[in-house]
């Protein structure tokens, strides 16, 4: 049975992703600190599934994050973890920037250490917000980053840190 470690899986997108994969033969560990917008109530059925485990945890400690990864031994890591409310990021930018950048960097660091033992991929979930507002058409991956809020700037920063980890440490962080 494959094992997926999911960070931030209690938000809107993470919940829907877990709903989808929980029907497959995949063992799931969801790590989430449960913020104000988390949707844990929306998947009470999943909580009862034998292939699903939830662990309430704040990703602020890179060493503890590594211990969780190392003990679970995932085949893939999917990082949804981020505070994502644009308006709240405008009223409290320091919290958003600090939380999103530090949490993702801690995940990348822990992944880098685990990657030395087992070559797995980490899928870092980004947002179209990193490209800013388009007057016409939609954004594509090669577009220039043009964040328009502290939230989107924090996500753009984590994307760039992921790219730097790949270049510096030869890891396989995929930005989606």
Question: Language-model segments: which ranges?
Answer:
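N-terminal Rossmann-like NAD(P)+-binding domain of SDR-like oxidoreductases, especially those catalyzing
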Residues: 1-176
């Amino acid at each position: 049975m494959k094992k997926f470690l999911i960070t931030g899986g209690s938000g809107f997108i993470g919940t829907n992703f877990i709903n989808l994969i929980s029907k497959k033969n995949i063992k799931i560990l969801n790590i989430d600190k449960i913020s104000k917008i988390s949707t844990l109530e929306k998947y009470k059925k999943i909580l009862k599934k034998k292939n699903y485990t939830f662990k309430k945890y704040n990703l602020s400690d890179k060493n503890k994050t590594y211990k969780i990864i190392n003990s679970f031994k995932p085949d893939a890591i999917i990082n949804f973890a981020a505070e994502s409310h644009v308006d709240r990021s405008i009223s409290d930018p320091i919290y958003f920037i600090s939380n999103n950048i530090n949490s993702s960097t801690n995940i990348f660091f822990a992944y880098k250490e685990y990657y030395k033992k087992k070559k797995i991929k980490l899928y870092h979930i980004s947002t179209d917000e990193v490209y800013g507002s388009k007057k016409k058409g939609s954004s594509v991956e090669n577009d220039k980053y043009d964040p328009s809020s502290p939230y989107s700037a924090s996500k753009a920063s984590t994307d760039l840190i992921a790219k730097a980890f790949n270049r510096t440490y030869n890891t396989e962080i995929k930005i989606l």
